[in-house]
Amino acid sequence: MIEVSYPGGLAVNAAVNGFTIRTDQPEAAGGGGTAPSPFDLFLVSIAACAGYYALRFCRERGLSTLGLRVSLGAERDDAHKKIARIRIAIDLPEGFPERYRAAMLRSVSQCSVKRHLEEPPAFEFSARAAAVATSAERELALSAV
C-alpha cells in the first residue's frame, strides 16, 4: 500500500516500503519546486526500469558496465496535453559485443513499467469518510489555505 501525505504548499509525499518519496509542483505551476513533480517521477520510473534491465543484461553475461548509460526523452503532444512518444537510448558499455546489441534492446524493452503502459491495469477510485485528524495535521491544513 502506498500512503500519501501533505507536508505543505503543493508538495505531496508518498510512503512506500519504508521510503518517503517527496514530490512538488514546479514554481511555474504554483509549487515550491523543491522536489520532482509526480509526472517527473513517472518518467523516471520508466528510465530507471530500463536502466535496471540494461544493467542486469550485462551482469548476467559478465559484460563490463563501464560507460553504460540509459537516457529517456519525451516528445510532447501539446494539443492533447500529454506525451506522444518516449524515446529510450542506451549507450552501450566499452567493448560491448555487437552480437548482443539486438538482445540488449529486447531485454530493455521488457521493462515492467513500460509493459504496464502498453497493457494498462484497470483503475478503481473510492472515497471514504476521513479519519480524525491530529492537531498538527489540522494546523498544517489550515496554514496551506
What are these regions (language model features)?
Residues M1-V44, Y52-V145:
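Extended beta-strand/beta-hairpin segments
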Residues C49:
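Alpha-helical metal-binding/catalytic segments enriched in His/Glu/Asp
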